[in-house]
C-alpha cells in the first residue's frame, strides 16, 4: 500500500521498520520538528526523523497541523491508501483523518478503552494491571475513541518497568499494524464501560509518598522508570530511585519514610521497601551498597 507514517519517539520506530519490511511504500513521514536537547541545547531530530532519513523517505516536520489548510492540502495530495500514526504528538483534524482512502490507523499502547490518553504504559504499571497490550484503532476526532481493528495483550510482570514494557509493546505495535493493513478487519466500536484515562505525566508524579504501601510505591518506581522517575529527599538532597524491592511481610512500628536498620530499607504505610538502586544529583545511578559506602544512613533517618 501507499502509506503516510506519522510518529516521533522511539516507540514509533519499530512500526516504521515493520511497514517497510512488509513491502509497503511509505511516501512521507511526519514527525515533530527538531527540539533543543542536551547541555548545549543543540537541535536534535526525533528518532523517527532519523529512521526515515536513513531509509531515504521524505520527512515533513510541521509545528502544527490542526488549522493549517496548506498542510491539509499537502497531506491529501500524497494520495495515500492509509496513514499509520504512532505517538505523533499533534492532533489531526478531520480534513487529515479523512484524506487517505482507508483513513488513519493509530497504534495505541493499551487495551482500549482502558488507558486512553498520553501515558498508557506508565499508568498500567502504576495501577497494578496484570496485562497491557496494543490496540490498532481507526482514528476519529475524539481522544483515542475510535473503533478497534485488532488488539494483542501481553502480561505485565512483577519486574516490568515502563522501559521494558515500552519496548515490548512497540514491537507488538509494528507487527499488529502490518497485520491490520493486510487483513483489514471490521472495526469494532469501543465499549462504553471500562473507560479510563492516562494523564500527561509531569515530574511531580514521581514524588514518593511513604504513607502508601510498599507494593504501590514499587509500582510507582517501575512505572515511572526511566521518566519522569520516582524520587524522595534525604537531608534536602533529591534521590532518584531506580529500583526497589517491596517487603510486604516486614513488621515494624516506625513512621513511614523511616529507615529500618543500617540499610536503605524504608518503612511504608504498609510493609517496607528496600531501595536497590538510586541516583544523586549530577551522578550516575548506583547500587544501594555503593551509596551507603560513601554516605552511611543511620537507623531512624527520615526520607520525605
Curated annotation (Swiss-Prot):
Phylogenetic lineage: Bacteria, Pseudomonadati, Pseudomonadota, Alphaproteobacteria, Acetobacterales
A single GO molecular function term of this UniProt record: methionyl-tRNA formyltransferase activity
Family: Belongs to the Fmt family.
EC number: 2.1.2.9
Keyword annotations of the record: Protein biosynthesis, Transferase
Ligand binding ((6S)-5,6,7,8-tetrahydrofolate): 110-113
Keyword Transferase: yes
EC class of the enzyme, as a word: transferase
Coiled coil among keywords: no
Catalysis: reaction(s): L-methionyl-tRNA(fMet) + (6R)-10-formyltetrahydrofolate = N-formyl-L-methionyl-tRNA(fMet) + (6S)-5,6,7,8-tetrahydrofolate + H(+)
InterPro entries (UniProt xref): Fmt, Formyl_trans_C, Formyl_trans_C_sf, Formyl_transf_N, Formyl_transf_N_sf, Formyl_transferase-like_C_sf, GART_AS, Met-tRNA-FMT_C
Organism field: Gluconobacter oxydans (strain 621H)
Stated role: Attaches a formyl group to the free amino group of methionyl-tRNA(fMet). The formyl group appears to play a dual role in the initiator identity of N-formylmethionyl-tRNA by promoting its recognition by IF2 and preventing the misappropriation of this tRNA by the elongation apparatus.
Protein name in the entry: Methionyl-tRNA formyltransferase
GO cellular component labels: cytosol
Pfam families documented for this protein: Formyl_trans_C, Formyl_trans_N
Amino acid at each position: 500500500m501507499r502509506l503516510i507514517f506519522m510518529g516521533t519517539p522511539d516507540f514509533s520506530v519499530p512500526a516504521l521498520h515493520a511497514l517497510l519490511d512488509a513491502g509497503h511504500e511509505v511516501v512521507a513521514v511526519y514527525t515533530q520538528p527538531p527540539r533543543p536537547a542536551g547541555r548545549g541545547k543543540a537541535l536534535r531530530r526525533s528518532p523517527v526523523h532519523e529512521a526515515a532519513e536513513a531509509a531515504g523517505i521524505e520527512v515533513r516536520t510541521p509545528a502544527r497541523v490542526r488549522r493549517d489548510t496548506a498542510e491539509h492540502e499537502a497531506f491529501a495530495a500524497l494520495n495515500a491508501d492509509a496513514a499509520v500514526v504512532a505517538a505523533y504528538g499533534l492532533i489531526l483534524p478531520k480534513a487529515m483523518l479523512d484524506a487517505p482512502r482507508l483513513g488513519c490507523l493509530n497504534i495505541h499502547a493499551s487495551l482500549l478503552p482502558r488507558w486512553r490518553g498520553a501515558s498508557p504504559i506508565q499508568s498500567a504499571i502504576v495501577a497494578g494491571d496484570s496485562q497491557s497490550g496494543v490496540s490498532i484503532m481507526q482514528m476519529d476526532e475524539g481522544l483515542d475513541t475510535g473503533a478497534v481493528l485488532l488488539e494483542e495483550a501481553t502480561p505485565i510482570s512483577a519486574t516490568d518497568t515502563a522501559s521494558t514494557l515500552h519496548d515490548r509493546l512497540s514491537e507488538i505495535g509494528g507487527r499488529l499494524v502490518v497485520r491490520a493493513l493486510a487483513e483489514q478487519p471490521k472495526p469494532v466500536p469501543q465499549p462504553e464501560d471500562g473507560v479510563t484515562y492516562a494523564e500527561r505525566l509531569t515530574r511531580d508524579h514521581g514524588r514518593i509518598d511513604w504513607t502508601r504501601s510498599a507494593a504501590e510505591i514499587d509500582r510507582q518506581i517501575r512505572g515511572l522508570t526511566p521518566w519522569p522517575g520516582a524520587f524522595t529527599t534525604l537531608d534536602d538532597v533529591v534521590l532518584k530511585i531506580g529500583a526497589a524491592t517491596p517487603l510486604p511481610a516486614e513488621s515494624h512500628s516506625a513512621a513511614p519514610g523511616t529507615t529500618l536498620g543500617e540499610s536503605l530499607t524504608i518503612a511504608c504505610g504498609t510493609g517496607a521497601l528496600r531501595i536497590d538502586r538510586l541516583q544523586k544529583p549530577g551522578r550516575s545511578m548506583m547500587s544501594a551498597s555503593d551509596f551507603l559506602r560513601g554516605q552511611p544512613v543511620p537507623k531512624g533517618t527520615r526520607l520525605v
